[in-house]
Amino acid sequence: MHFVFLTINAHIYFMSRNASTDELYFVTLTVTDWIDVFTRRQYNDFIIENLTWNQKHRKLNIYAYVIMTNHIHMVANVTDGSLGDVLGQLKTYTSKELFKMIANNGQESRRDWMINAFERAGKYNPLNTNHQFWQNGNYPVLLYSPAVIDQKIDYIHKNPVRAGFVGSAHEFWYSSANPESPLKIIQ
């Protein structure tokens, strides 16, 4: 049995790893053309709801995360099955629903532009019908040591600071750096 020493908010956690299912990965889900979709609370809250559902029903384990305006970073794994399958199902469902949310949002000033961009991207990808919300791939990076785990969690948490959204990582609402974050992570 292998162990990972996971440090979150200066606390060290011990987690056993099974090479087939419990490897920790740094993953990124990116909106097509880097479109800034996650500027509205309702879209962010929808992502939180779906990540929470996947934690409960698909055994998605999230150790750190941040929702930026056009991408999501996570340190994650799954208890059962394939992380790629879980993320693929998450992306398929959220793609359809977010597209509908944007299309039906009369308050969305960029609605027509975003819908056209997603439809255009979908037209050129044979894997899609009608539109493409997420870029293909999750860009998984295996986190093979405690130092790499710490580096990726630090990178995730400092992303909103580097973007100029907040002065300190713990101030960003949609991040595991915030102790009151709406998404509960494994600690």
Positions of the model-derived regions?
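Short catalytic/metal-binding and nucleic-acid-binding patches
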Residues: 1-187
